[in-house]
Amino acid sequence: MKYRRILLKLSGEALMGERPYGIDPEVLQSIASEVASVVRAGVQVAIVVGGGNIWRGRKEAAAQGMDQASADYVGMLATVINALTLQDAIERAGIPTRVQTAIAMQEVAEPYIRRRAIRHLEKGRVVIFGAGSGNPFFTTDTTAALRAAEIDAEVIFKATKVDGVYDADPKTHPQARRYDVLSYQDVLTRDLRVMDSTAIALCKENQLPIVVFDLTTPGNIYRVVQGEPIGTWIGQTTPKSNGIPARLAQESGS
């Protein structure tokens, strides 16, 4: 395998499948099976999961006139629901798993402790981080960047419903162009919104590459962790620099 330790960012929406709300059991089982195969290949896997399949903090706050901080706390609890569900699915796939939350809830999960999380990873356990960063006004993408830096992950894999980063929404713009390679600065200056600016800044500061890929294609989690050039690679360097993966550089025409 190309990587030793990774962080997988799953949006809550990714768990819905084609449902309008909640969790699709088939999608959950598929994700768990692929994560299990990656762990069996010797890769240490941490996961940050969102909660948008249950609660959309900013959207709900705006619609109901709810205080933003309160709405964000509800969203954090939604991520814990997803984390516990994902834990059960991965353990049924035969892989030991721990959930750590940024908000203490000792009856259902461990508190987030960096050194303990790293020790779990070293023992071959999947660690799922719930409750975001524990602070309102921060997204789960920012949490993913923060936790990846803290546990010394080599890369963040952001699983989405599209096969990379585009210059426009491919669902509404059929002529939208997909990028194979981007620098952090490209993402910020072009306002591509693959992650919020705080998350991108954290990744840039810690030189954490991001790979955005399509979760809906079976086997893609294993392929992308193996190093296959699928999706969009985002990093410190531009396509003409020496730091990007060679195959991606070839694809981008460098």
From Swiss-Prot:
GO terms for molecular function: ATP binding; UMP kinase activity. Pathway: Pyrimidine metabolism; CTP biosynthesis via de novo pathway; UDP from UMP (UMPK route): step 1/1. ATP binds at K9, L10, S11, G12, G52, R56, T160, Y166, D169. InterPro entries: AceGlu_kinase-like_sf, Asp/Glu/Uridylate_kinase, Uridylate_kinase, Uridylate_kinase_bac. UMP binds at G51, D72, S133, G134, N135, P136, F137, F138, T139, T140. Catalyzes the reversible phosphorylation of UMP to UDP. Homohexamer. Disulfide bonds: none annotated. GO terms for biological process: 'de novo' CTP biosynthetic process; UDP biosynthetic process. Belongs to the UMP kinase family. It is found in: Cytoplasm. This is Uridylate kinase. Gene3D superfamilies: Acetylglutamate kinase-like. It comes from Synechococcus sp. (strain JA-3-3Ab) (Cyanobacteria bacterium Yellowstone A-Prime). It is an enzyme of class 2 (transferase). One of its GO terms (cellular component) is cytoplasm. Its main location: cytoplasm. Keywords: ATP-binding, Cytoplasm, Kinase, Nucleotide-binding, Pyrimidine biosynthesis, Transferase. The keyword Zinc does not apply. NCBIfam families: pyrH_bact (TIGR02075). Inhibited by UTP. It catalyses: UMP + ATP = UDP + ADP. Its EC number is 2.7.4.22. Pfam families: AA_kinase (PF00696).
